[in-house]
C-alpha cells in the first residue's frame, strides 16, 4: 500500500 498507488491497485 502506498496511498494513491494502493487506490489504483483496487
From Swiss-Prot:
GO terms for cellular component: extracellular region. It comes from Solanum lycopersicum (Tomato). It comes from the Eukaryota. It is found in: Secreted, Cell wall. This is 80 kDa cell wall protein. Keywords: Cell wall, Secreted.
Amino acid at each position: 500500500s502506498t496511498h494513491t498507488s494502493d487506490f489504483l491497485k483496487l
